[in-house]
């Protein structure tokens, strides 16, 4: 073959094979690809699609299995975990049932979570979605306003879910949406007002169709809708909505309804223990939510009401030490990476829990307390090669000075790895 023929002979731009060595060569603008490379690329793409998160609802875990998983991350709240496990199981069982073309069509049951700040409402919803391997989105009800006013449209909630599902609409339509601070969209008074309540009752009205199940038009870039843009169509019929809120003040409404109206010497005296918020919330009725400011139609679309208890000292100590992502375990690991052993004594844990109770922040405030307490020592430790152990005692919350113990020989040694995990050895003295 002449050199001129070699130049004229076409080759695949990817594997370099000539047109004589392959069955077909497809031309593009200044580039060629053979049938073998096309087949290889197709296999790679198919493998990637198979590796994507699949929403497998055929092998749905039982309520006991769901609760067992929740127990690993959420301390206490036994009644809430059982109620949520059953509700989620029934929701996805309903999706499977409605695809079988039965005579009976099961309706959706969204969930309302009531509990004090820091009691675990958001964590429960997040953990459920993680276990079920379904797309999950968190929305803040305080940013929502009625259509036509400054703020977010309710459809933006669905956009977050679609984005978390990598724009796979079919996957997103079986996801979970958690709407936080739902109590903040309660209408301002029980009586209808002549002025529009655009961030209260107006938002409740806008959420009704989405909660019930509708084909919603979602702007792909978020923000307000305008007539000259394309929309993403998503059916919300099989999306599970969990709405959570602290509902500050609803306890007084429940008290007024439940207490016996008696005066004088025969009046019943309630102790502070009897007025525990978590116990009061268990007696909540739809009428109490109505008086709080939720409209009847909105209450009707959240038929499952789950209440959470206020966390006491014992529960907060368990939260600090027991879950897989416990704060004490996290800080111990951070110190271990600097070859320093960290120890919290029991009295210190009690003080941290009491401080969280005093601040009325629940479990959410634990990290802030520990971070404030450990800031100085975490700043100094990497530079102090002679420190081998740090002990946090009950005085550390006030003094912010843990007890420091020098390493043997004046210089710390690498902490021995646990369970066979390899660590890089640092220089020793």
UniProtKB/Swiss-Prot annotation:
ATP binds at residues 116-123. The keyword Lipid biosynthesis does not apply. The keyword Zinc applies. Residues 1-53 form the ClpX-type ZB domain. GO terms for molecular function: ATP binding; ATP hydrolysis activity; ATP-dependent protein folding chaperone; protein dimerization activity; unfolded protein binding; zinc ion binding. Residues 408-429 are annotated as: Disordered. Zn(2+) binds at residues 12, 15, 34, 37. Disulfide bonds: none annotated. Keywords: ATP-binding, Chaperone, Metal-binding, Nucleotide-binding, Zinc. Residues 413-423 have a biased composition (Basic residues). GO terms for cellular component: HslUV protease complex. InterPro entries: AAA+_ATPase, ATP-dep_Clp_protease_ClpX, ATPase_AAA_core, Clp_ATPase_C, Clp_protease_ATP-bd_su_ClpX, ClpX_bact, P-loop_NTPase, Znf_CppX_C4. One of its GO terms (biological process) is cell division. ATP-dependent specificity component of the Clp protease. It directs the protease to specific substrates. Can perform chaperone functions in the absence of ClpP. Belongs to the ClpX chaperone family. Component of the ClpX-ClpP complex. Forms a hexameric ring that, in the presence of ATP, binds to fourteen ClpP subunits assembled into a disk-like structure with a central cavity, resembling the structure of eukaryotic proteasomes. This is ATP-dependent Clp protease ATP-binding subunit ClpX. It comes from Clostridium botulinum (strain Hall / ATCC 3502 / NCTC 13319 / Type A).
